């Protein structure tokens, strides 16, 4: 049981925490029990306009702050974040459901992301182009794009907010973050660590009615850049809204990651890695391995080994023995259970275990012998569900893996150089891990293709997303 007192946060506007003035309030619940934790007060139209006004004012100052000072301020904020890891992790587990170990890891990952961006602030370089005329110079400059509107989800609220906060602030932008209403306290605690080291208004945090917030922020001439992580339908809507107002947008959307397991793969090692990765955060990860295409020669052994997921200890995230917590909400629980039922009706064979009755729990489930037209092969589960299909040739596996609108992450297990070359060139994903799990690190770009979005976060590409380019030709 956590000893951390849970309270829903206020809004951060202009460097001050203030209550939201919207007439509507939302109840935040503990996914492990379904019981209410507190009520969240939302941003009103006046709150949104005040946030826009103050973010514009803050940007005019922050853009002129030298990169070395921006770096130092962010690094001090990161130090505060690390000092508060235990408290923030407890808040995250209470409101989101993931295990305490996973919550601690997420805090560490968020700190690493912001620190990397802080260091990158000192490495934003322009360039000199050889001039065409005597007594002249041609130069290219990089400068901050302007105030940013950022939208982050509930599944990894710290990490996915940190990707946006770190890049925008390091680049010299101010940022208005609309974080997920399901997980408000943990993000507010992280943002507070940064805010204490920044000038007022550089970072602002809002919670509100999503349609009202997105319309107000994206339509405003103050906002110059939009960044969103979330579902494909919402991403499409925000892309249309951004296009209408000619705003640059980065979209990191859904995933349905394929895993190709070749005949020479080490089954025990592959299953051990993939079970850890698949059922982390109860499978609520856009890069979670989900569709397993397994060489027919080892398919039976693979399914038997994967069936050991029934031994995973499912329970409340605060319990030390828990290996997988609940899904985040009753709505998510119902959606995952419905997808399993429809896929079983289509011919899939379920391998699952029992789970606690109270709370929003879904059993870690493997669907074996899945028909290619079963719903789970095309719909993102976003829960603790994996599906397995045998293949007879690598060409067949690649074709089946690509037969899906998503293209975020993919995985390959083999020692064959020929197979690695073929999959790396032909698998339609933004990130590929070979014989491992690492597809998301601060120093490398992360983003998808097809319906998984466009643009990158993290890496130098993620920093570029918050920068504009100016060319100057000077003749003496």
UniProtKB/Swiss-Prot annotation:
Enzyme's top EC category: oxidoreductase
Residues noted as binding NAD(+) in the record, renumbered to the chain: 154-155, 178-181, 230-231, 253, 380
GO molecular function: 4-(hydroxymethyl)benzenesulfonate dehydrogenase activity; succinate-semialdehyde dehydrogenase (NAD+) activity
Gene: tsaD1
Leader peptide range in chain numbering: none
EC number assigned by the record: 1.1.1.257
Role summary: Involved in the toluene-4-sulfonate degradation pathway. Does not discriminate between the sulfonate and the carboxyl substituents and can also be involved in the p-toluenecarboxylate degradation pathway.
Protein's name according to its UniProt entry: 4-(hydroxymethyl)benzenesulfonate dehydrogenase TsaD1
Keyword terms, alphabetized: Aromatic hydrocarbons catabolism, NAD, NADP, Oxidoreductase, Plasmid
Similarity comment: family membership: Belongs to the aldehyde dehydrogenase family.
Superkingdom: Bacteria
Regions crossing the membrane: none
SUPFAM superfamilies referenced in this protein's UniProt entry, alphabetically: ALDH-like
Matching Gene3D superfamilies: Aldehyde Dehydrogenase, Chain A, domain 1, Aldehyde Dehydrogenase, Chain A, domain 2
Reactions that this protein is recorded to catalyse: 4-(hydroxymethyl)benzenesulfonate + NAD(+) = 4-formylbenzenesulfonate + NADH + H(+)
Active-site residues, record numbering mapped to chain: 252 (proton acceptor), 286 (nucleophile)
Listed PROSITE patterns: ALDEHYDE_DEHYDR_CYS (PS00070)
GO biological process, one term: gamma-aminobutyric acid catabolic process
């Amino acid at each position: 049981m956590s000893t951390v007192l849970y309270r829903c946060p206020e809004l951060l506007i202009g460097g001050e925490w203030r209550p939201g003035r919207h007439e509507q309030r939302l109840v935040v619940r503990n996914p492990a029990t379904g019981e209410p934790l507190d009520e969240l007060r939302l941003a009103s139209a006046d709150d949104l306009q005040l946030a826009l006004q103050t973010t514009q004012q803050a940007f005019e100052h922050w853009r002129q702050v030298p990169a070395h000072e921006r770096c130092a301020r962010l690094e001090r904020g990161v130090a505060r974040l690390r000092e508060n890891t235990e408290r923030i992790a407890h808040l995250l587990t209470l409101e989101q459901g993931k295990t305490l170990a996973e919550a601690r890891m997420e805090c560490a990952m968020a700190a690493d992301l912001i620190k990397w961006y802080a260091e990158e602030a000192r490495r934003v370089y322009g360039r000199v182009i050889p001039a065409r005329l005597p007594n002249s110079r041609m130069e290219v400059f990089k400068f901050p794009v302007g105030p940013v509107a950022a939208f982050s989800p509930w599944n990894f609220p710290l990490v996915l907010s940190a990707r946006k906060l770190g890049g925008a602030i390091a680049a010299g932008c101010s940022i208005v973050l609309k974080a997920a209403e399901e997980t408000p306290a943990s993000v507010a605690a992280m943002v507070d660590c940064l805010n204490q080291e920044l000038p007022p208004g550089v970072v602002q945090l809002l919670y509100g009615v999503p349609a009202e917030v997105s319309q107000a922020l994206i339509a405003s001439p103050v906002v110059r850049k939009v960044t969103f992580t979330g579902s494909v339908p919402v991403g499409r809507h925000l892309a249309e809204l951004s296009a209408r107002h000619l705003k640059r947008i980065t979209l990191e959307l859904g995933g349905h990651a394929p895993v190709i397991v070749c005949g020479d793969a080490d089954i025990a090692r592959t299953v051990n890695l993939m079970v850890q990765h698949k059922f982390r955060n109860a499978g609520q990860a856009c890069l979670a391995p989900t569709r397993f295409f397994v060489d027919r020669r080892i398919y039976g052994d693979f399914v038997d080994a994967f069936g050991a997921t029934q031994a995973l200890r499912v329970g409340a995230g605060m319990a030390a023995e828990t290996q997988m917590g609940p899904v985040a909400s009753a709505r998510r629980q119902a959606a995952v259970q419905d997808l399993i039922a429809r896929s079983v009706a289509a011919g899939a064979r379920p391998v699952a275990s029992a789970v606690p009755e109270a709370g929003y729990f879904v059993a870690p489930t493997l669907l074996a012998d899945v028909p290619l037209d079963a719903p789970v092969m095309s719909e993102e589960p976003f829960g603790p569900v994996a599906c397995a299909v045998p293949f007879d040739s690598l060409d067949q596996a690649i074709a089946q893996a690509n037969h899906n609108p998503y293209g975020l992450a993919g995985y390959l297990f083999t020692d064959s150089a020929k197979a690695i070359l073929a999959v790396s060139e032909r698998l339609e994903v933004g990130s590929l891990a070979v014989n491992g799990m690492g597809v998301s690190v601060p120093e490398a770009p992360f983003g998808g293709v097809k319906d998984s979005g466009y643009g990158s976060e993290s890496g130098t590409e993620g920093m570029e997303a918050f920068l504009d380019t100016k060319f100057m030709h000077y003749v003496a």
